[in-house]
């Protein structure tokens, strides 16, 4: 990753269930950008669900996968990247976020609970 800032690289951050994976494709479509969901990328490359990764190898290994996915996505311009809910809490990921615009999807914990309940 070059570390160069690009206005055509947009990171979506927010709590799990805040709508990053829903808003991301819509925003990408409007802007004629590519969309990347880092959780989906991790699941595709690892062959495991996020829950399975956490269970089998733990959060630290998951965060390493997440950082790799974010770096790969950030190599591109004209892209909207939905980051995992905890991604911004790790220093290495914060450096990647500095390479583009960051949009925080602000949602209350109560709304997240409602969203999760509706999904199940």
Language model features: what each stretch is:
Residues 12:
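Hydrophobic anchor at the beta1->P-loop junction of P-loop NTPases
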Residues 15:
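P-loop (Walker A) phosphate-binding loop of NTP-binding proteins
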Residues 18:
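ATP-binding Walker
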Residues 21:
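Walker A/P-loop
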Residues 98-114:
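Conserved phosphate-donor/acceptor-positioning beta-strand/loop module used by diverse small-molecule
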Residues 115-120:
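Conserved small/polar residues in nucleotide/adenosyl-binding loops
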């Amino acid at each position: 990753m070059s570390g160069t800032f690009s206005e055509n690289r947009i990171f979506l951050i927010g709590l799990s269930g805040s709508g990053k994976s829903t808003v991301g494709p819509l925003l990408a479509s409007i802007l004629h950008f590519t969309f990347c969901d880092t959780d989906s990328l991790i699941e595709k490359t690892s062959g495991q669900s996020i829950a399975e990764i956490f269970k089998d190898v733990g959060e630290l290994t998951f965060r390493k996968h997440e950082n790799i996915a974010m770096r790969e996505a950030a190599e591109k311009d004209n892209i909207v990247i939905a980051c995992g809910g905890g991604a911004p809490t790790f220093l290495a990921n914060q450096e990647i976020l500095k390479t583009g615009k960051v949009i925080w999807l602000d949602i209350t914990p109560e709304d997240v609970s409602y969203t999760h309940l509706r999904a199940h």
